[in-house]
């Protein structure tokens, strides 16, 4: 039995900002924290090698005070939409129907802080 990848597709979330645009939001989010901790977090954001960050939530919502459950509910709702769009793109690219698929591989990060897929 041979295994092969027939098609690969992706779907970016609707919101994006440059790292430079995100840094002030991170600083505001961390206000009141230890100054050394804030510098470390900002350094991580700045040196991550990520020029543009995509999110299922607008940056104001990402850094708003919400519970784990609220962010996770958003993650569950929104990642399904992204997955469905990405799957349809892959099916179209392959010229297949959903019933032709044997296996799907996904990569995901749960909604602990910043929900992403």
Task: Give the residues covered by each predicted segment.
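Short glycine-rich or small-residue beta-strand-to-loop segments that form or flank ligand, phosphate
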Residues: 102-108
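Conserved active-site "lid/cap" helical segment
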Residues: 1-102
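Conserved catalytic cysteine-centered active-site region
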Residues: 51, 55, 108-117
């Amino acid at each position: 039995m041979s295994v092969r990848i027939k098609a690969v597709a992706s779907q970016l979330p609707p919101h994006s900002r440059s790292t430079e645009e995100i840094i002030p939001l991170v600083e505001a989010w961390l206000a009141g924290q230890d100054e050394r901790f804030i510098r470390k977090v900002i350094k991580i954001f700045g040196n991550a090698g990520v020029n543009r960050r995509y999110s299922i939530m607008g940056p104001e919502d990402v850094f708003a005070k919400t519970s784990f459950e609220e962010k996770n509910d958003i993650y569950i709702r929104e990642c399904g939409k992204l997955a469905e769009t990405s799957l349809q793109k892959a099916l179209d690219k392959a010229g297949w129907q959903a019933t032709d698929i044997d296996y799907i591989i996904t990569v995901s990060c749960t909604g602990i802080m910043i929900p992403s897929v």
